[in-house]
Amino acid sequence: MTRPAVFLDRDGTLIEEAGYLDRLERLVFFPYSVDAVRALNRSGFAVVIVTNQAGIARGIFKEPFVAEAHGYITRRLAAGGAHIDGFYYCPHHPDGKVEAFTKACECRKPAPGMLTAAAADLDLDLSKSFMIGDRWHDLAAGAAVGVRGVLVRTGYGRTEEASPKEVTPAAIVDNLVDAVSWILRES
């Protein structure tokens, strides 16, 4: 059963931008995030987080913390009747300090590796899918595999909107709930 997905950037899109999120106390949901994810769940979309986590390569935090943060997100969404179908993260950065994660890779956005991995794992139809993010490189990852992108003005979005476009978005909206409303109208 191939189904469409909505790929979500994590920081600045689903949750507030906190720089390198290295403690759960700094993980703050936008007030509308649970409702937005639940609306996507009910509409039949797979909801997949795709997030660059260069803090691992830079030695700021370790991989178990990413799993802990994603567990917290899962529990918080479940309490509101919502869920994420898959979490994908890239631990790499070409200028890292931790040798095992210091490299150029195909998973770090704007490369589409996390999206293609999710599509294979979850049997997703990329041609009917969307990418929501607050940075041009989020949307570029989607565009590389034919996924339409929606830029949100939360996180780095307002700054990105004012900078030269790396990719042409299908829409630019204020926040995640507006992006979900736009997607549900378009599909």
Predicted features, each with a name:
Residues 106-139:
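Conserved Lys-Pro-Asp/Glu-containing loop-to-beta segment of HAD-superfamily phosphomonoesterases
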